[in-house]
Amino acid sequence: MEKREFKAESKRLLDIVINSIYTNREIFLRELISNASDAIDKVYYKTLGDSSLTFNKDDYYIKIKPNKEERTLTISDKGIGMTEKELDENLGVIAKSGSLQFKKENEIKDGFDIIGQFGVGFYSGFLVADKITVITKAFGADKAYKWESDGVDGYTISEAEKDSFGTDIILHLKANDEDENYDEFLEEYKLKSLIKKYSDFIRYPIKLDVTKSRVKEGTENEHEEYVEEETVNSMVPLWRRNKNELTDDDYNNFYVEKRFGFDKPLRHMHISVDGMISYNSILYIPENIPYDYYTKEYEKGLELYSNGVLIMEKCSELLPDYFGFVKGIVDSQDLSLNISREMLQHDRQLSRIAKNIKTKIKNELESMMKNDRESYEKFYKSFGRQLKYGVYDDFGMNKDELKDLLMFYSSKEKKMVSLAEYVERMAEDQKYIYYAVGESNERIEKMPQTEMVLDKGYEILYFTEDVDEFAIKMLMNYKEKEFKSVSSGDLGIESEEENKKENEENKGIFEAMKEALGEKISAVKASSRLKNYPVCLSSEGEVSIEMEKILSAMPNNQGVKAQKVLEVNTNHEVFNSLKDALENDRDKFNLYTKLLYNQALLVEGLSIEDPVDFTNDICKLMK
């Protein structure tokens, strides 16, 4: 038995494989199981071309055998096996893929699904082992061979004894240290967990001897342990089954099994795409919002599989942020993986899949809004805010994608309505889509600014979330109808001539009020929108009063202020008191003006700038 050196730069490359390529030790089992699956696939392919051979799938499986006494973990398969030459060529040369070589030699086209691509997966065993022993017998061969290496000083190949074709890979685990407990890879629960996590959908049974408990024969309460071989993996993934044969319960159970959520999802999508891109997917729209959804801890992403093998637990590239609530899986053979299969190469295929998924989700939501309004409103209650963030984010790049999914509470319908539904009901003479901003529907209904719009019979949309107005400002218009806040300076329904006349007739008192308030407001003018209230605040420019409130509450705010206009109802009896005070008692006039301004602030939900001064003014008024 001679000692053989790894070929060419293989020794250095092996060190890179062990220490640099793989970032997660536990994937060694995924790699070795995938290799075992490929080996069985090769037997199947051999039998296709030889009528004298048969392939009974029930005879083929992968066995995982931990040995705690010897601290070894064995992965066995009933696969194609290797000759002495193949052992030397495949395991003596790092990064030579025996699977790819097999495809070339047998002129196999891409339809034959072999997982291995790079020829390094076997060496991931050195992540947890300081020695690897391989005992193998090639399909149709008489002799078996043993390959052995410590991953440092080359390897040896010698003849061995093995009854049937296939391969046993024996990992001699490293000694435990302060940082790593390698013994955990001998524990039944850990092995089952890794198989379910990474290799649940390998097409052949993965078997493990499992310790179970039962009532001892002849007793009532005495239990005994026994060992039973158990198939751990599911084998046939749900997404590869005929969707016409699946029930809602099948999808719901899968949702819970994958721990996407513990309640029933609101909707599921089973997608199978072939063509320029090929992938299978099952996507879920949750009914309830995850507890951490609007926190930094939440991670979006779909489980990503390649040929049924888990590559990434959360592939964020497959979902835009505004659809980050979607759960599910994607399986594709067309992905360009990096050498460790832990990460993706950024390529067109991934982008195409992501684009296709985005379209599928949008279509599903539009269908839900149209055909199952009750379910859509449940969804929107949980995730509507995220859609509105999507409109606002990235400088409005996605606004056209999302605008038809938005809904707001309607003053006329007393329920949530879409923008399309609002526009369809607009009066012929109505120029704008009107909205009001407030902390709640009840608060908005008491706003003095709504009076004139409602008197015209126009509908008002209620914006009660902090993102609402920011999203609409980014949207700007819908079906060529501009959005207009009821608190804006010009509603488009006032009589310009009457306004001009009112402002000219009361120019003196308005100038005096502006002088009393100073820089707190940009102007005082007559209001045509008020009926029952003496004053209200409106705004001019891009920043509304509500936006000022939101921005001022943010850390490191830049002191952004709305240009506030104090509008005065010249038909209100308080206005007569103001005129009298201006003529007879300027101090009282200034007091009235300040009180009216503070009243307008309170109605808007804004803080009074000087509460002590305000209470003193009230006391003066009561003397």
Swiss-Prot record:
Pfam families: HATPase_c_3, HSP90. CDD domains: HATPase_Hsp90-like. The keyword Nucleotide-binding applies. Residues 1-341 are annotated as: A. Residues 342-549 are annotated as: B. Residues 550-623 are annotated as: C. GO terms for molecular function: ATP binding; ATP hydrolysis activity; ATP-dependent protein folding chaperone; unfolded protein binding. Keywords: ATP-binding, Chaperone, Cytoplasm, Nucleotide-binding, Stress response. GO terms for cellular component: cytoplasm. It is found in: Cytoplasm. Its main location: cytoplasm. Molecular chaperone. Has ATPase activity. Homodimer. NCBIfam families: PRK05218.1 (NF003555). Belongs to the heat shock protein 90 family. This is Chaperone protein HtpG.
